[in-house]
Amino acid sequence: MFGTALSSSATKVLLLGSGELGKEVAIECQRLGFEVIAVDRYLNAPAMQVAHRSYAIDMLDANALEEVINKEQPDFVVPEIEAIATDKLVELEKQGLNVVPTANATKLTMNREGIRRLAAEELQLPTSPYRFVDSYEELVEAVKFVGMPCVIKPVMSSSGKGQSVIKTEADIRTSWDYAQDGGRSGAGRVIVEGFVDFDYEISLLTVRAVDGVHFCAPIGHRQEDGDYRESWQPQVMTEAALKQAQNAAEKVVNALGGYGLFGVELFIKGDNIYFNEVSPRPHDTGLVTLISQEMSEFALHVRAFTGMPINQVTQYGPSASSVILGQGTSTNIRFDGLTEALSQPQTQIKLFGKPEIDGRRRLGVAITRRDNLETAIEDAVTASNKVQVIY
């Protein structure tokens, strides 16, 4: 049973993280009449613009986090980012707080070490060779073990922050320093990963719901500087590779538990798969599902964590997304060129409403649906390029 927003029966959803993904989750909650409270570290974040109330706090501050939760008494707490005081969520969950999908899943996946050890050591899934290190000296030894080239990442970071490639011994010191500056909670432990010789990588959006585990069609994507630039669905795969991918994803989400949508990242080589990472929430590459599916990843997430059945995931056909990337400094961002960008049918522009920019920032996305993937990707890129960001 669900209540009505702003009434004594209200079903309250508290979002921890209020970026563009949280905004879409908030919109789906609004469609069901839920009361939405958005939290982030800064004011006027995208999800705050479509929420009933909002708070700007340091979500790594356990006391500040607990204060907001105690004040609002939400029915569901929905993390959208990694930089959260997860130990406090674990503590509050034991007292009855409903964390999506679970507090432990949120804690485990915010740290690359936790999820890598779960996948590789407990679930025995194939992964790239890896080592965790705490010092520059340990890094030197780890590079010898995994070989060059290799990737170094802070164990707590996202969107490519602090991530770099070590190609020669001369890169080791630079990469170490960069990783220490890029972690979400400051300097600390890093993971060193050997390269996997893969053909392509996918995001397999996997829903764990009251009526079982469901899969979206695989999403392919192109990365640049550690962040996605284009994504498309469905990614063409062999039947054997898809089956392996689904089996691995199901093992991971069942191990994490709870209800919700998980973004499972996998490398594919022929018929073989290698586990990379998992997020217990909607995935940025899944923005394409706003046009490619009957229920977007955000709608699926809300339906699942509120205990409603999924029944089936319907995909409409070849679709793509292309990021609208800003580069500049402004607290008054404007956009032009939308008329030209929307000149083709089955094309949409989503602008996130981010209040400011200082450097490079993802500000929106163009999404398309076409008769074939090549045209969908090409037209999405064309549409995103026609949007002019004015600083």
From Swiss-Prot:
Mg(2+) binds at E265, E277. SUPFAM superfamilies: Glutathione synthetase ATP-binding domain-like, PreATP-grasp domain, Rudiment single hybrid motif. Belongs to the PurK/PurT family. The keyword Ligase applies. This is Formate-dependent phosphoribosylglycinamide formyltransferase. It comes from Aliivibrio fischeri (strain ATCC 700601 / ES114) (Vibrio fischeri). The keyword Aminoacyl-tRNA synthetase does not apply. GO terms for biological process: 'de novo' IMP biosynthetic process. Its EC number is 6.3.1.21. GO terms for molecular function: ATP binding; magnesium ion binding; phosphoribosylglycinamide formyltransferase 2 activity; phosphoribosylglycinamide formyltransferase activity.
